[in-house]
Amino acid sequence: MPHRIHSHQSPPQEINMTFKSAITVSLVEEARGGPFVYWEGLKDACEKSAALGFDAIEIFAPGPDAVDESELKGLLQEHGLVVAAVGTGAGMVKHGWSLTHADADHRAKARDFVKQMIDFGGKYNAPAIIGSMQGKWGGDISRDQALAFLREALDELGPYAAQYNVPLFYEPLNRYETNLLRTVDEGVEFCKTLSTDNIKLLADLFHMNIEEADLAAAIRAGKGYVGHIHFVDSNRQAAGMGHMNHEPIIQALKDIDYDGYLCAEAFALPDSDTAAKNTIEAYKRLTA
């Protein structure tokens, strides 16, 4: 009778993908009323988000020097939080800078500002986000020229972010905010034309609800490119407060092995505390 060899190897284990929760805090007074949950400073945001069980904060700061490094690191340590990402939109909101502006000096200033924000985020291992600073085409600038300027910028800024071992997030926006790239698929195809592989897409569910025919299918098609999620509802309020069906979206994220943040870039409606509470309740229900 042949000798039977017994294997001591354990059966393969199913990988348990774990999402992480994050919430936005704006320090930019000029953006007051915009889609950010917390507005009363980092101390307030850290205390309240940690108490609710969030894993991280996403910071929208007016500039790289607006935050005291030792203070923020102390708050993060005290409350068991990290920084999920940092926005660069203050470059547009405060200065009107765009990466696709017709003037070369203007574009250089825009890139320098983004680099400074990459440096700021790098202190906390947090990627920076290119959203509104991508600009638009029109006037003397054709769409092809604007996309060439954007490609030039991302090919410079992506490798710059790599020194901190983080990607740079590029966010397709809806038609009312940009006329460049508006869908995940357009973002993926654009990324394929870059010389850097350090650009990941930020998929914002609010923008996607306007531009995508099928949000879950768009996310699946973005496998390997989607690096960050803005987790909101159809009306840009907290998840659960609009008419979006989040279950297929969460399943799609699981299908592409997404293990990043679901971050609430939502209006503080009816107020910050309620928006935060609604968000974490929806997050826990959907990711249980």
Segments from the language model and where they lie:
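N-terminal pre-domain/capping segments
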Residues: 8-122, 155, 196, 280-288
